[in-house]
Amino acid sequence: MQYLVLLSSGFLYFISLICGNGIGFWLCLEMATLLSVCGFFVPGISFNRYNPLMCFIILSGVSSILLFLGVNNDIFQLFIFLSFLIKLGIFPFMGWVLLVYTNVSWLLLFLLGVVSKVTTLYIPLSGLVGSEVSLGLTLSGLNLVVASLMFWKSINGIKGFVAVSGLGTSSLLLAVSMETTFYSLLILLVCYFISSGVNFLVFHYLENVSISSSVNGLLFFILLAIPTSLSFIYKLISVFIIMSLPLSFICMWVLFSISEQLFLCMLIVEKSCVTIKVI
């Protein structure tokens, strides 16, 4: 039953894009958010669920109010931009992402961290891009820099890596949605969904099963941006899409990508070493 509820929540994120008006978009997001709350109560799994749940409800409520005001009156269009900053975890609203993402099940993490990002398509569809472009690029760039540092200072474990990696993706999607075309954003999202779907399956396996040297190389190939791997194809497509963005943003994205790959490599090696010691 719980899986059906979360599946319905994910479906509503996609439906929100074809509602035809701002109120329909807001209503679908509200329903998706309410349904996703069920994912915090996973039987048989012990999480520190109440602090993340309260944080999620409060931030979702604030974001919802801002979005509702923005879609109802053009004067408050800036509020839509602020709502997306909160939902995507863009600087300075990064903290809730770490708190929530590291204390939920993998299914809910995929829903909140990957599927919900489809809502960024609303930005070019609704023509929201305006005076907020420079501010959006600046905050996205800062988000990438801070996330790069967080890899080495603020995270622990696989879910922590996924959370910070998601912050970088949010920055990329926001910048692309404001500076490029709808189709560029759509292509990037499709590649991201495919790559993340495979990676999430591997991360779930990596967290729950001790790996041996025989599968260590396979994990490196799947997760790292090695030529012909899914991650490499996703990164390569990202490079082509962001070429029209300011050079400063591209440099910050490169910094983030290098930090991400180095930390991921260290994570796999560390997991392998732990397995060897146990054996």
Give residue ranges: language-model regions.
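Core, highly hydrophobic multi-pass alpha-helical transmembrane subunits of bioenergetic inner membranes
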Residues: 1-279
